[in-house]
Amino acid sequence: MLETGIRGEAKEVVSESNSAQAMKSGELKVYATPSMIALMEQAAYKSVAAELEEGKVGTLMNVSHISATPLGMEVTAKSELVEIDRKRLVFKVEAFDERGMIGEGTHERFVIDNEKFQEKANNK
């Protein structure tokens, strides 16, 4: 059963492929904000995937990237389900490298019917 307090986690090592330079979100070889956001979303998704048979889609990210992380360092994203409002799920998300917090914010996901959602997208 889905309840607030469910936590998730996802990890990756900073490499050239997830750097700001490679993601075209900046010029430097440091962990890219889009990569951090994707890792946070992955942590939230993984935390509820086993609890819900229905589909889940991300709809909102409000995140601050507060510290740069160099190549080779591991990043861990953590999520906590803090609110359930019918089909809307709200998560607190945080990201840490080996030296401390690098990002924080909130993420919303909605529970959906996968087939109907895919059909609607395909009919655009």
Where are these regions (language model features)?
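Hydrophobic residues positioned within well-ordered beta-strands of beta-sheet architectures
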Residues: 8-10, 59-61, 77, 91, ...
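Hydrophobic beta-sheet segments that form the core/acyl-binding groove
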Residues: 63-98
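Residues at secondary-structure transition points
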Residues: 27, 31-35, 70, 90
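C-terminal binding/interaction regions
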Residues: 3-6, 85-91, 100-121
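Hydrophobic beta-strand-centered segment that forms part of the acyl-chain substrate-binding groove
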Residues: 44-76
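Catalytic strand-loop segment that frames the active site of acyl-thioester-processing enzymes
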Residues: 1-31
